[in-house]
Every structure is written in structure tokens, then in C-alpha cells.
Amino acid sequence: MKVRRQVLGDEYVDAALASVTPLTKGLQDLIAEFVWGAIWTRPQLPLKTRSLINLGMLTALNRPAELKLHIRGALNNGCSREEIAEALLQSAGYCGVPAAIDGFRVAREVFESYQPEQQ
């Protein structure tokens, strides 16, 4: 949970946990234990690199809500706006220009509203 909070911020994680229902509990457990507990905590890649990888995958999958969340996470992990833009540009060559255009739209929204959480 520590890494999840570090990347996504306390406010987001608290809201996600507060919204758990009996229907979504299994999914939330999977996310907490597997994605954030087993994957993000591995020492082989720094969090910044993991964030940039996620941006490419979420752009390719056309998942704007998750992309928005993970652009914020990338900023929290120390990625510059230029690095994020470069990751989105890289996705244009492999995922297609329309996917990258949507990714840049999402990035612009995040950049305009991003306020680092006080740690």
C-alpha cells in the first residue's frame, strides 16, 4: 500500500478504498496485492521507469481514465513533462497517431490541473 500511496497519492487511494463494495472487493484485493504489492515493489525497475511503461500501455489500450491517473503518478514519481510527452510520442509509432493524440489530450488536462500532494 505504501508504493500505491506514493505513486497515486493518499487522496486517490483513500477514495478507492472507501468505494469498495462487496461486488468490487475481490478486484480491489487483486489490485492491492498483485499490481501494487507484487509488481510495483520489484526492485529491478525504478518507479519512474514503471510509470513511463504504463503510459505507453495505457495509451495503446485507449484507457484515458487510467492514463490520467498514471500521468499524475508519473509526475509524482519524478517524470518531467518532457519525458511524459516523449513516452506519448513514442506510442504514436507503435500504437498509432490517434491513440497518441488522445494521450496528449489527457496529458494536457493533467498538466493544467496537477498539484503535487503534500507528503
Feature locations, PLM:
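Substrate/cofactor-recognition hotspot
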Residues: 97-101
